[in-house]
């Protein structure tokens, strides 16, 4: 019996020595270190880290804590309340996300809302990190990553906090904030490491916002690829999740198709270059595999383009009720958009309810490379329908010698702090381009009850996205046959019950309806704007490419230091990414040790020779 015990001890200690399991063991599962546990860093440990990263470490409280006792301060609460809608400010705050939903913790019933409505209500930490390394250099980020790895901490990466899936926050976590990595440099003839020149490109730090990139690119006479919202970080989850540009994607493709090189810090704290000539597997995974999953990206390099002339048309109309006349006009608007957005032209349309309850439609079309076109001529049928239905509308066209000057005008800069959930679907070309496609789409959408503030937003795809079918990256193959990305935004009150109610509505009611569009084969779902409780997310986000992503993550991050909600490998962990899910004894030592989460003695009894 003594020999057996010694053998068990050897097996147990050797498993720990591999360094591939978190250090806390609760009898059933291996967990990361949490506050209050012996393994949690001491104050001296945090102070030592702070000194090593030049004083950029801060202890974090939710931004709303100044509006709650015992730290209530009337003046500070008023100041934070005024700043709360500023997306740029929220991006810079370690204690904030862009969306309320991912500042609170439903599992712990913790929230800390901004505003003086109820100062006596306690402020819970929620999903806001305990500490943040607000790094200013790559070297500081490397030290922070090594610290998190050695201390077995729940690590989160926040770029700007634009994240509808909860990937930028986690309970009891240690955050690395990349907002201060702001370098932008243009390269006339970019040469990827170990490669030939590729033409004009831009290298940007992880903290560069869309509005910052667009403004500097315009100053240099370039057009850059980025998203619509001014306060999104281009090099973060935007490009690593795919990267849709409202104006440029049909002409140029997805941002993940274009990116030429990543500088990334690995789970071991090493700075590596990933491009098509070195670390090709990492390069493949970073282009569509999702942000914060296989490493911390410190900079990217991507091509820039010359001046692109553009005529941009904007049309909008409203209706007090969603009657037949309203939906008739919506159908014609989609037919016209579909017919116009070919040959590199692009478009976006919104259908929703305003704060007062009225229904609205907004359409923006980008006629790119065409200077002598008359958009009104292209939209004649829609304008006639609006007149026939006696619907008042606003329509204007603006010509821009350079699209970049339009992009440099910040969009959506003051929409931070909104409480909303998202859902989306990629609509396949076969459905959308059919004679009845737009009409059937509107009939489906009309079934959904919209509350004030709710809306549908559609971006046209196709074009170069489809033409890039041979680009080898982690993007779901469904992108190559999709015509439209349709996104639903659903507003809720800043209260946990309201948040839960809206989430249940999305997942149980609206989700199945969305998934039915284009049946029997809907294409895919965009991971950057997805239902937070989506089932089978691996298939919807990546399809047949998920297995390869798992393999690459196991190679580069076997301990899952980089873990995000509904990200590669997260199914092995609990909801908060704190403890590994328990596997059956049969699965344990048969799989790699980093997945060994079953009860130790059950594993030993199965796999120690002669024990049974």
UniProtKB/Swiss-Prot annotation:
One Gene Ontology molecular-function label: oxidoreductase activity
Cofactor: FAD
Gene3D superfamilies found in the cross-reference section: 3.30.465.10
Enzyme class (EC, first level): oxidoreductase
Glycosylation site residues: 50, 86, 109, 311, 396
Pfam family, one: FAD_binding_4
Record keywords: Alkaloid metabolism, FAD, Flavoprotein, Glycoprotein, Oxidoreductase, Signal
One of the GO biological process terms: alkaloid metabolic process
PROSITE patterns attached to this UniProt entry: FAD_PCMH (PS51387)
Domain FAD-binding PCMH-type: 124-307
Superkingdom of the source species: Eukaryota
Biotech utility: Notoamides have been shown to exhibit antitumoral activities. Notoamides A-C show moderate cytotoxicity against HeLa and L1210 cells with IC(50) values in the range of 22-52 mg/ml, but the IC(50) value of notoamide D is greater than 100 mg/ml. Moreover, notoamide C induces G2/M-cell cycle arrest at a concentration of 6.3 mg/ml.
InterPro entries assigned to the protein according to its UniProt record, in alphabetical order: BBE (IPR012951), FAD-bd_PCMH (IPR016166), FAD-bd_PCMH-like_sf (IPR036318), FAD-bd_PCMH_sub2 (IPR016169), FAD-linked_Oxidoreductase (IPR050416), Oxid_FAD_bind_N (IPR006094)
Pathway involvement of the protein, from the record: Alkaloid biosynthesis
Keyword Flavoprotein: yes
Signal peptide positions (record): 1-19
EC number: 1.-.-.-
Function: FAD-linked oxidoreductase; part of the gene cluster that mediates the biosynthesis of notoamide, a fungal indole alkaloid that belongs to a family of natural products containing a characteristic bicyclo[2.2.2]diazaoctane core. The first step of notoamide biosynthesis involves coupling of L-proline and L-tryptophan by the bimodular NRPS notE', to produce cyclo-L-tryptophan-L-proline called brevianamide F.
Similarity comment text for this entry: Belongs to the oxygen-dependent FAD-linked oxidoreductase family.
Matches recorded under PANTHER family: BINDING OXIDOREDUCTASE, PUTATIVE (AFU_ORTHOLOGUE AFUA_1G17690)-RELATED, FAD-BINDING PCMH-TYPE DOMAIN-CONTAINING PROTEIN
Protein name, UniProt field: FAD-linked oxidoreductase notD'
Source organism per UniProt: Aspergillus versicolor
GN (gene name): notD'
